[in-house]
Amino acid sequence: LPTPDEARENTITYGILRAHDVDGSKGDSMRIKFDAMMSHDITYVGIIQTARASGLEKFPIPYAMTNCHNSLCAVGGTINEDDHVFGLSAAKKYGGIYVPANQAVIHQYAREMMVKCGNMILGSDSHTRYGSLGNMGVGEGGGELVKQLLNNTWDIKAPEVVLVWLEGSPRKGIGPHDVAISLVKAVFDSGFVKNKVLEFAGPGVKNLPIDFRNGIDIMTTETTCLSSIWVTDEEVKHHYDIHQRPEDYRELRPGKVAYYDGMIRIDLDKQEAMIALPFHPSNAYTIHELQADPERILREVEEDARKRFGDKISIDLVSKVKDGKVYADQGIIAGCSGGTYDNLAEAASILKDQSVGNDYFTISAYPQSTPVYMATTRDGIATELLEAGVVIKPAFCGPCFGAGDVPANNGLSIRHTTRNFPNREGSKPGQGQISLVALMDARSIAATAANGGVITAATDIEYTNAHKPYEYDPKIYERRVFQGFHKENLDEELRYGPNIKDWPKMYPIQENMLLELAAVIHDPVTTTDELIPSGETSSYRSNPLKLSEFALSRRVPEYVGLSKRIQKEDLERRDGRCPEKIVDVLAKVGAGPGDTSFGSCVFANRPGDGSAREQAASCQKVLGGDANICYEYATKRYRSNCINWGIVPFTIDKDVKFEYEPGDYVFVPGIRDAILGGKEEADAKVIKADGTVVDLKLHFAPLTKDERQILADGCLMNYYAAQNKK
């Protein structure tokens, strides 16, 4: 038998990764070049602006830009459409693919037009997952896409691979979200699959239609895994055939002897209808468990909310229980996970000849692309939904990130979308608002709608699903999508709106580093939605200074003011007018202001779960942030964002208590030499407000050679500027 390392090479995962590793070796590190890239309208402006400042000439690989987030253009005057116009001009200038507003959500366009078996796609969205179609997808912050645009690589340690073994077949009423929520619940808290690749196989795969597989696959992001891949079969071949790309299919199977670092077994026969309660997809129960003990379970959610928000909000979920039944206020079926043809078809079957009624409960459905929307219209699905009282809306990611269908205060929305993080649905706790999202499968949402808003498992009702299989019509994309790859026109002028601004100046690290704590968060996990809110805030994504005004605004409202004060004092220091208090603090550790960087710092137990959006890090940098300190980073992508924006990703040992407060200082001597010299830790000093000095060991490994230089230079743009001068 081969050794484990030899047999790991026989996984589908390693077959694809090694084929994309420019080093061509079988070592412990990989330098990956991707086949294509995806971005949406929250991220592509910043990526292109960064790439331009770093020497971009043209797009070297297919790069599709979709407009599915701020595509309603409902807030901020012209700024959202200004970004869309910029995107089209960039596609023309540099040779990109431009998908106009509301034609498709980012990941459905990739499934329809971009994926190929054995390929790899990098996306500036955390839910970049196409493994069910034989294409490994990776979600990262914009800096990693910039590297690919400049013909550089995605550098990773060779990952572990976990086998997800599927058996059985789901019964009627069970959908992909039920399986996905169960998977997230099983592995999230333990970190069992963190930064690993999930490889799906087993006899149960053949029993799942493509939309079902896609629905599970897209949610693997919520497990904190690195990527995913599935075995391919006739069902996958059919997907490529109907999308008129049969040449992009090939069979993918592991070798005869393949080694996996772990295994998850899922018996689809036993899958129950699920509900993930606020404030995470892992906070999951079977719907029957909720029905059996609703007051206790909902009271636990209330208590969690009070711990998070204190007296800023008033929450009353238990009032949703009436006569032992739990009532929802809103239902949503949307986005890359929810708005599939099969989900909408089965929801329509459940609601056929039913009514959602005329009371408080409302429901909306968002087909995930225009081809899917056209098929629901052609096949009578839209008619059945509309007759039941469902509002049908365009391909739009709004309900998934707080830019559409924000519920009423204290409202409970059940959604087939990807996340239910705090305030991600759009509520503003600073204004006393709170609304809550529970994740459910489209089938159970439809059953709930048919039952007047009483939360109901679709397995508990009778219905017949008789809709025809999906047929894809390419005409709308042929007519509307700008296909510019290999057709760049460098004479094309980029079109700028008044909100599109360049990045402000960022400084290299000096010999020493003094940090002032501007936020200390002891929540178990801090999401990127808390670090920088989504929703209407993201309309300012192309204006770094204006967007940074919202950093941590829903979790630590005083953070921006503190950071601005720290940044102002650092600028005075750089101008030779160092504030006396900074001189005094440095004197306590025998240092001076001339060779010591000064910036703000965020401490959180486990930051970075959720979105890949680089603004979670860049906004800190724009405000003068120089470091994060934590016990561990929730995801690789957030840590990479920190590095690419020159924020040193410190960690501390798990047995060390971090009992410091905003206004305390952390001094890190010799940090520049430590980073450039290949060291992995530093002996720091905490200077507390009362003058007490405490030792603190900080770790910052692993870092590649390039990442060390990026940190020393202050950010990725500075790094490329320095390279271009050589």
PLM feature segments, named:
Residues 1-726:
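Fe-S-dependent hydro-lyases/dehydratases of central metabolism
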